[in-house]
């Protein structure tokens, strides 16, 4: 695995969602142009991406659920896995200040994730986790 930050690692789920949406738009355009060969290529690519997305989402969700802090793991799942906005994440945590969630709690959650999986993020392994 290529060296990534915890944020980049978790963003893989959101990024593949964006790719699938883009390909679906391209598929729609190709269908309108009756380009059957290209339509079939796009369908196969989308199918492969969806399979990859399911596996990645399942793995990352399981890794997050192993974290000892339920509040921080909920934050990571709501934002990175479920793709919710920071406002929705704050509401899921029972908080009103989305800015605090986005800036402060997110940083704590990412540090906790990095500390829990040092094999992925060796240069984060010596970070002090704020409590």
Predicted segments, located by residue:
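Short N-terminal micro-motifs specific to bacterial/archaeal maturation
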Residues: 80, 92-93
């Amino acid at each position: 695995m290529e060296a990534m930050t915890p944020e980049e690692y978790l963003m893989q789920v959101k990024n593949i969602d964006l790719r699938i949406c883009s390909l679906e738009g391209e598929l729609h355009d190709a269908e309108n142009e009756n380009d059957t060969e290209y339509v079939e290529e796009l369908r196969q690519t989308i199918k492969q991406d969806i399979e990859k997305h399911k596996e990645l989402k399942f793995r990352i969700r399981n890794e997050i659920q192993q974290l000892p802090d339920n509040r921080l793991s909920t934050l990571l799942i709501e934002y990175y896995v479920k793709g919710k906005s920071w406002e929705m994440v704050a509401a899921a945590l029972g908080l009103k200040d989305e800015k605090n969630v986005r800036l402060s709690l997110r940083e704590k959650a990412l540090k906790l994730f990095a500390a829990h999986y040092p094999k992925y993020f060796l240069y984060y392994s010596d970070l002090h986790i704020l409590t």
